[in-house]
A protein has these predicted regions:
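Catalytic phosphate/metal-binding cores of nucleic-acid and nucleotide-processing enzymes, i.e., regions
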Residues: 1-94
Length: 94
């Protein structure tokens, strides 16, 4: 499955659970996670989506570390099974 298709399913499933899901595009700061998820309780989660065989770039690893250093919840999900698990467990982050 293509990353674009994974992103579409991710967004649709989380919106069905009452979350806001935004595409994170920062032209001046490359390597940021694909999506920002905001739960109905105000929790903010950063998510990088990859195919099952996807690989993080060095820049993506650096950006994820920066977010985590600032005590932000940042995730990397590989493929549809991990997306489904994340969505099924979103209540843990509310």
């Amino acid at each position: 499955m293509l990353e674009k298709e994974i992103e579409k399913k991710f967004k649709k499933a989380l919106e069905a659970k009452g979350c806001l899901v935004y595409k994170f595009a920062s032209p001046n700061c490359r390597g940021v996670p694909d999506r920002i998820v905001i739960t109905d309780t105000g929790k903010v989660l950063f998510v990088e989506l990859k195919t099952e065989k996807g690989v993080l770039s060095k820049l993506q690893r650096t950006q994820l570390k920066k977010l985590r250093d600032f005590r932000q919840q940042a995730f990397v999900l590989y493929g549809l099974p991990e997306v489904e698990e994340f969505v099924n467990n979103i209540d843990d982050w509310r």
